[in-house]
Amino acid sequence: TDLRAFARLGEEGVDLFMTDSTNAEVPGFTALEKDIGPVLENLFGHAERRIIVASFSSHVHRVQQVLNAASAHGRKVALVGRSMVRNMKIAADLGYLDVPKGVL
């Protein structure tokens, strides 16, 4: 974290800067978002049986990646959980989620 950059923001008049990140307190690095899609594609292409993916119900981009990988390999996706189903319906209705025909 570039603490000097945060200090400069304060000097420029920013009174409050808030951010949140899952596992921010855990040392090390996580994979970049752009790296996840190819991993899912590989997994969906090579797994011989059922694949179970867990995700936050607010992570529309991750669900899109799963839908794309499933579609590319002729697999089906089942959304489980009231929040997941509701959020993905809203995302699809607003055009933020493209559900390939026959995948859900």
Model segments located where?
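His/Asp/Glu-rich metal-coordinating catalytic cores
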Residues: T1-L104
